[in-house]
C-alpha cells in the first residue's frame, strides 16, 4: 500500500512538473511572439522608406535570420542609401524609394571604401555619428549580405563589396584600476 501510494504521488508530481513546464513554455512563446510581432512591424515601417527591391531581400533572408538581424540590416541599408543620396551627384534629386538597381550596379569597390570612410564620422539631422572598427565591420557585413543576395538572385551582375577588405578589429587594451 505504501509503495502504491508513493508511485501515485510520483505520478502526480510528474504531471505537475509537466504542467508547469508547459505553462512556462507557453508563457515564453507568448513573449517571443509579442517581440517578433513588434520587430516585424518595425521592419515593415523601415521598409516603407526603402526601394522596392529591398522588400524582396528581406523576404529572401527571413528563413535564415532573426527579426533583430533584419532590423539591423534595415538600419544599415538606410544609412547606405542616405549616403548615396547625400554624396552621389546622380542621386541629388531622388528619394530613397527612387534608387534604382542600376545605380547599385555602377558602384565600384572604391565607392564602398569611401562609404566606410564616411561612416567614421558623419552628421545626420544635426546629430553627429561615429563608428569604430566594430561598427564599420557590421555595416560592411550588412552591405555584403545585401549585395550577395542581389547578385545571387540575378538582380545585379557584379558585387563591389566582394573586393573590399573587412576592417580589422584590434584588441581592446585592458585597463586596470589601482
Residue positions per predicted region:
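N-terminal core-binding DNA-recognition domain of tyrosine recombinases/integrases
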Residues: 53-68, 78-173
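Basic/aromatic DNA-contact patch characteristic of tyrosine site-specific recombinases
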Residues: 1-102
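Short, conserved phosphate/pyrophosphate- and ester-handling motifs at nucleotide-, phospho-/glycolipid
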Residues: 178
Amino acid at each position: 500500500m505504501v509503495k502504491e501510494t508513493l508511485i501515485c504521488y510520483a505520478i502526480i508530481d510528474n504531471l505537475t512538473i509537466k504542467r508547469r513546464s508547459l505553462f512556462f513554455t507557453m508563457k515564453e512563446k507568448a513573449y517571443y511572439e509579442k517581440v517578433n510581432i513588434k520587430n516585424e512591424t518595425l521592419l515593415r515601417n523601415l521598409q516603407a522608406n526603402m526601394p522596392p527591391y529591398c522588400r524582396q531581400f528581406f523576404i529572401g533572408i527571413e528563413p535564415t535570420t532573426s527579426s533583430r538581424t533584419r532590423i539591423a540590416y534595415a538600419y544599415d541599408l538606410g544609412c547606405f542609401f542616405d549616403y548615396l543620396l547625400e554624396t552621389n551627384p546622380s542621386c541629388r534629386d531622388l528619394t530613397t524609394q527612387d534608387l534604382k538597381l542600376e545605380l547599385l550596379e555602377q558602384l565600384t569597390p572604391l565607392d564602398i571604401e569611401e562609404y566606410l570612410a564616411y561612416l567614421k564620422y558623419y552628421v545626420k539631422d544635426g546629430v553627429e555619428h561615429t563608428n569604430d572598427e566594430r561598427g564599420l565591420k557590421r555595416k560592411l557585413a550588412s552591405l555584403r549580405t545585401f549585395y550577395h543576395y542581389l547578385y545571387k538572385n540575378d538582380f545585379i551582375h557584379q558585387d563591389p563589396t566582394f573586393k573590399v577588405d573587412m576592417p580589422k578589429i584590434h584588441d581592446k587594451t585592458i585597463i586596470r584600476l589601482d
